[in-house]
Amino acid sequence: MPEIIYAAAPGASNGTTTTATGGGWGSLLFMLIFFIAIFYFMIILPQRRREKQFQQMISQMKRGDTVVTIGGIVGKVIDIKKDTVKIKTANSTELEITKRAISTVIKERSQENQEG
């Protein structure tokens, strides 16, 4: 029984030695490149796609289109400026909002009927 305890004790040697070998800088560099690639494909690339879609949506917006803001306000576009859009809500209130505050652009119905 004492042999079992001795063999299980830390630092006990049975005549063979093992050395831990590290991966060195190569494996560290590989892991770093791997995580940067994952970060790029999971975060940066989709964000660029969303930004491109948003810019396209805003550039195609015109007077008469209905927009929904990020706050949930729905209105009809009555004027478009460089950075802002003036909309008219259901109770005839005119609001000037930034283009960044627009969540969705709903095309004018008469134009959709002519196209489709």
UniProtKB/Swiss-Prot annotation:
Subunit structure: Part of the SecDF-YidC-YajC translocase complex. The SecDF-YidC-YajC translocase forms a supercomplex with SecYEG, called the holo-translocon (HTL).
A GO CC term assigned to this protein in UniProt: plasma membrane
Role noted for this protein: The SecYEG-SecDF-YajC-YidC holo-translocon (HTL) protein secretase/insertase is a supercomplex required for protein secretion, insertion of proteins into membranes, and assembly of membrane protein complexes. While the SecYEG complex is essential for assembly of a number of proteins and complexes, the SecDF-YajC-YidC subcomplex facilitates these functions.
Pfam families in the record: YajC (PF02699)
Organism in which the protein naturally occurs: Thermotoga maritima (strain ATCC 43589 / DSM 3109 / JCM 10099 / NBRC 100826 / MSB8)
InterPro entries: Preprotein_translocase_YajC
Compartments (UniProt record): Cell inner membrane
Residue stretches spanning the membrane: 25-45
Membrane topology: Single-pass membrane protein
Keywords for the protein's UniProt record, in alphabetical order: Cell inner membrane, Cell membrane, Membrane, Protein transport, Translocation, Transmembrane, Transmembrane helix, Transport
Family per similarity comment: Belongs to the YajC family.
Protein name in the entry: Sec translocon accessory complex subunit YajC
GO biological process: protein transport
Principal location: membrane
